[in-house]
Amino acid sequence: MMPFGGIAARLQRDRLRAEGVGEHNNAVKYLNQDYEALKQECIESGTLFRDPQFPAGPTALGFKELGPYSSKTRGVEWKRPSELVDDPQFIVGGATRTDICQGALGDCWLLAAIGSLTLNEELLHRVVPHGQSFQEDYAGIFHFQIWQFGEWVDVVVDDLLPTKDGELLFVHSAECTEFWSALLEKAYAKLNGCYESLSGGSTTEGFEDFTGGVAEMYDLKRAPRNMGHIIRKALERGSLLGCSIDITSAFDMEAVTFKKLVKGHAYSVTAFKDVNYRGQQEQLIRIRNPWGQVEWTGAWSDGSSEWDNIDPSDREELQLKMEDGEFWMSFRDFMREFSRLEICNLTPDALTKDELSRWHTQVFEGTWRRGSTAGGCRNNPATFWINPQFKIKLLEEDDDPGDDEVACSFLVALMQKHRRRERRVGGDMHTIGFAVYEVPEEAQGSQNVHLKKDFFLRNQSRARSETFINLREVSNQIRLPPGEYIVVPSTFEPHKEADFILRVFTEKQSDTAELDEEISADLADEEEITEDDIEDGFKNMFQQLAGEDMEISVFELKTILNRVIARHKDLKTDGFSLDSCRNMVNLMDKDGSARLGLVEFQILWNKIRSWLTIFRQYDLDKSGTMSSYEMRMALESAGFKLNNKLHQVVVARYADAETGVDFDNFVCCLVKLETMFRFFHSMDRDGTGTAVMNLAEWLLLTMCG
């Protein structure tokens, strides 16, 4: 069962986020560590910082390849930079790509992303804050800001680094006195649990965590027809673009093609222009090789004859803006020579130039929980509908003069959270994806609805992720006519648990919201009956059990209910517990005696009989238990509409290990819900949706509930 403390922490986090905590200028203090306060403590006490949250030792290194008994970690010593060199520096002469040399860890994907970051000083210093030094106010403590699943976090580290034979074990700088890159790698390892968790990944993962952007990947051999349009729009938005040529064998790595392009090498795309060439429009693309001096020698390369056949003013403009390592080529040659294109679209807060057009961005958090919201993909029609649902209202079509299609562009990015951290306990990436459906007419304009199984059985998706894949993120750019749509994110298989964020980027303003039920209860007025309305047989049974005082205690109620339920052989039940019976007495007891009289017991019994009818209706396979996936519909039949978060709590509390719900747990859930709703309504007499209570009232409610 989810601990109450976990729920309370989630509520607190939601409130802080609503107040702007997690934005780049107000980053979350990771593990509640305050860099400035910790640094000041160390300065005042004259000590160097040692991080208690990420101690320098075997667990920080890893669990398998870098585990405590691995040959790779034998002889490792943790040392501060001042123990390695005489004059350690944080950054020497500005951050450059030569500051990042790989060590004994397979995290080249991360280092390539850090290297690309050095090309954009403004973005770099969002991640690597100014004012850090091994000289002025040095206290052995540093900090970095990294984007993690929808929010920026400020990560504190000490400067104890793993070494072997007096040299850094992992990333290091070619400038041996410089340590910013090694400390950034340590901060990233801390976020993910240990260094080993960083092994293996995609450069786009690092791009996103250092910018807060969203990545798209294109196979240029199967590119969409409007690939040039996509590149042009991405550059207009200030996106980071990278391209590469696939390697087909180990011998291809860094191999140079006939026209001087390097295989397996990361290039940047920096411009896209149209020129008039011999009376026809020619599309040109500018490429940058950030690591070396090898440049393209084909058409439109430096000094090629094509430049003689365009307007001199165009030639001067295009060639004046060139930097070292940059070259132009035709878009046709680009598509033929290169294999892959990666686009990292920056969110508005990362763009500072006013002339850049911007995505409109919405971020949602969600969870897949076994038994309540982990329905799997469309191949699982019985459970697909229980996945979280998010609505997008596309209001305006794109502004594309050359495009006659009335359509809206938007990008959907689904990212699973914290899976690297799970590697230590055998977890890894789930296979994830999403589908997009048009909202039915009857549900348009409403957020307080969760589309049910029948809708998905009758309707096909309008779009979906290109594939379900076991990467941290899957994203696709989609074009659809203006209208209302829902996005259903899911794992490929049902019952897989994970947290996720869903990001929706639209070119024009749009309305996006989670599609979920409005919490409500259809509570009928209390049943009005008198002793004269009760059958004689029921009275006699009650009198035999209640005795002379004509009231039954919690203990007697347990005996009665379990005796009656035992007669229903079609029900699987462990019987009602004492706590369950206490909750029932709490619901029905009007005089505060903690006992039930004849009329109170009759009303309770009538409720249980009506709930039994509902339970049998949703025990679809007549097994005597109800699937927790049907719990949502059963609760609605009983008058209760709950949102996804509440359903997850209900299933965690009342379902068994196989996600089944037996009759006694079903009744206990309904008793609890009715008690809580009735109490809330009694405290919210004006119907404002808010109840105010003092500490004593709060404790009475929670202790009795």
Curated annotation (Swiss-Prot):
Residues that, per the record, bind Ca(2+) 3: D619, D621, S623, T625, E630
The protein's matches in InterPro entries, at most eight in alphabetical order, are given as: C2_III, Calpain_cysteine_protease, Calpain_domain_III, Calpain_III, Calpain_III_sf, EF-hand-dom_pair, EF_Hand_1_Ca_BS, EF_hand_dom
Write down the EC number.
Answer: 3.4.22.52
**GO annotation (BP), single:** proteolysis
Q: Which cofactor does it need?
A: Ca(2+)
Recorded catalytic reaction(s): these are:
Broad endopeptidase specificity
Q: In UniProt terms, what function does this protein have?
A: Calcium-regulated non-lysosomal thiol-protease which catalyze limited proteolysis of substrates involved in cytoskeletal remodeling and signal transduction.
| Name this protein carries in UniProt | Calpain-1 catalytic subunit
Q: Which organism is it from?
A: Gallus gallus
